Amino acid sequence: NLLTFHEKADELIEEEEELRNKHLEYLKEAAKLLTEEGELISNLQGFGNEEYDMDEYVNRMERIIKRNLDIYGDLQQRMQRFKKHMQEEEEAH
């Protein structure tokens, strides 16, 4: 059982590292999406409604929103799974 304990501890450490790396990756992507969103709103404010393509604005915003939801949904699942594994590891002691 000692080997199993060490294997589980190693798996938890690996999962922790993967979680941090994925969080950082998603944070960078979310920053790019936020920049794109800022550009969209700036363009919208800079033009009269007749001159700016609202279809493009709506389509791009929908894509940005969907990607953000995907990012944070995946991150939330990873966090919940990691939290569960931490609790299981604590209970094994």
Per-range role (PLM):
Residues 1-93:
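Extended, charged coiled-coil stalks and adjacent low-complexity, Ser/Thr- and Lys/Glu/Arg/Asp-rich tails
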